[in-house]
Amino acid sequence: MLNIMVCCANGAGTSLMMKMTADKVVKALNIKVGKMHHCSLSEGKSAATQYDIVFCPLNFIDMFRDAEKKGTRVIGLKNVLSKDEMEQKLKESGMI
C-alpha cells in the first residue's frame, strides 16, 4: 500500500483537484493506497517523509530534496491536472 501526498502553493483548490486526479490514476492502475492527502507546499515540505510519493508542481520540486534523501519519491508535474502525465510519471518512478 502506498501513501501519497499532493501539494500546491496554497493547499486549497488546486491540490484538491490534483488529489482527485491522483485518485483516478491509482484506481485505473489498480494501486492500493493507504492514505491520500492534499495540502499546501509548506505543510507538505514538513510532512513529506511520512509518504511514499509526493506530487507537486515541477517548479517546486527542489523544496522536497530532503524528503527524497530519506526515501520519499517526489514527482514534479508540468501540468498538475493531467491524468496522463501523472500516470506516466508514476510508472516511470518505479514505485508501481
Where are these predicted regions, by residue range?
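Short, polar loop motifs at secondary-structure junctions
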Residues: 41, 58-62
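A short, aliphatic-rich alpha-helical micro-motif
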Residues: 47-49
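Conserved acidic residues
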Residues: 52
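Ser/Thr/Gly-rich flexible loops in soluble cytosolic domains mediating phosphotransfer, phosphorylation
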Residues: 73-96
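Structural signal for conserved beta-strand scaffold positions within catalytic alpha/beta enzyme cores
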Residues: 38, 56, 75-77
